[in-house]
């Protein structure tokens, strides 16, 4: 696959991951139409919950406060579908953290695609390392959703789960791109060094002086490559130059 295509596909996949991970952040109570999980009339989101009775939203609260009177106003106890208490809701904080890491990775992917840093081995190595952390956080977000909401998980949560294999592909492509760019970089560096050494190791040797019939003097010089070591073979033919003087 051409490097240009790889960079373009990388930016597209990371953009899709950003969109997928943005939906859970917009769930209730920020948007009553988006639900991360539902159980016993409670609609859960990353930042809070709403209680809905017969399609009518009765109460919405940011944060999960198990000591609040409103929490137990409609049911005996506020529980997640997995029957865990709301005290474990602090695990949902991994969603905004994962989204932030993915956004930074998205910016890096755009820089790799649109600027000269796309051919910098150090920058691509940094992006590949960052992608590992972004992938692990996305995986942790999906596992937390499955742990809390089990079969009551709604489609925003499944989008997070779908972003996990996409993040794995992006991570793999970044390491592959880093390997290819590093190989090209060191090949060019080795070629430049070899070319410089080739001209730097030339030696002009005087071989002989001859006299012609008209008393002109012909001096023979040979331009040859000087080997780096005794074991190095000289494969290039010697170039002979003739100069004349009267």
Curated annotation (Swiss-Prot):
Tell me the disulfide pairings in this chain: none
User: Which of the residues are on side Extracellular?
Assistant: 30-91, 151-154
The alphabetized list of GO BP terms reads: ascospore formation
One annotated Gene Ontology cellular component of this protein? cell division site
Q: How does it sit in the membrane?
A: Multi-pass membrane protein
> Topology: which residues are Cytoplasmic?
1-8, 113-129, 176-246
Q: Which key words are in the record?
A: Cell membrane, Membrane, Transmembrane, Transmembrane helix
Q: Where are the transmembrane segments?
A: 9-29, 92-112, 130-150, 155-175
What the entry lists under InterPro entries is as follows: pH-response_reg_palI/RIM9, SUR7/Rim9-like_fungi
Q: What is its main location?
A: membrane
Describe the family membership recorded for this protein in Swiss-Prot or TrEMBL: Belongs to the palI/RIM9 family.
* Function of the molecule: Required for the proteolytic cleavage of the transcription factor RIM101 in response to alkaline ambient pH.
The identity of this protein, by name, is pH-response regulator protein palI/RIM9
């Amino acid at each position: 696959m051409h490097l240009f295509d790889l960079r373009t596909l990388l930016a597209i996949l990371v953009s899709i991951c950003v969109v997928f991970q943005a939906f859970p952040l917009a769930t209730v109570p920020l948007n009553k139409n988006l639900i991360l999980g539902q159980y016993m009339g409670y609609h859960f989101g990353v930042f809070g919950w709403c209680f809905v009775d017969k399609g009518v939203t009765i109460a919405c609260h940011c944060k999960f406060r198990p000591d609040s009177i409103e929490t137990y106003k409609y049911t005996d106890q506020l529980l997640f579908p997995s029957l865990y208490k709301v005290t474990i809701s602090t695990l949902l904080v991994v969603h905004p953290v994962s989204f932030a890491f993915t956004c930074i990775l998205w910016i890096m992917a755009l820089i790799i695609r649109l600027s000269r840093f796309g051919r910098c081995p150090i920058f691509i190595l940094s992006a590949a390392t960052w992608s590992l952390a972004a992938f692990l956080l996305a995986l942790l977000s999906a596992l937390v959703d499955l742990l809390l909401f089990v079969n009551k998980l709604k489609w925003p949560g499944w989008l997070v789960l779908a972003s996990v294999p996409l993040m794995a592909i992006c991570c793999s492509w970044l390491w592959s791109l880093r390997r290819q760019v590093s190989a090209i970089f060191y090949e060019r560096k080795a070629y430049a060094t070899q070319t410089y050494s080739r001209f730097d190791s030339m030696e002009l040797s005087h071989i002989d002086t001859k006299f012609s019939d008209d008393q002109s003097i012909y001096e023979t010089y040979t331009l040859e490559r000087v080997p780096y070591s005794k074991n190095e073979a000289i494969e290039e033919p010697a170039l002979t130059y003739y100069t004349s003087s009267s």
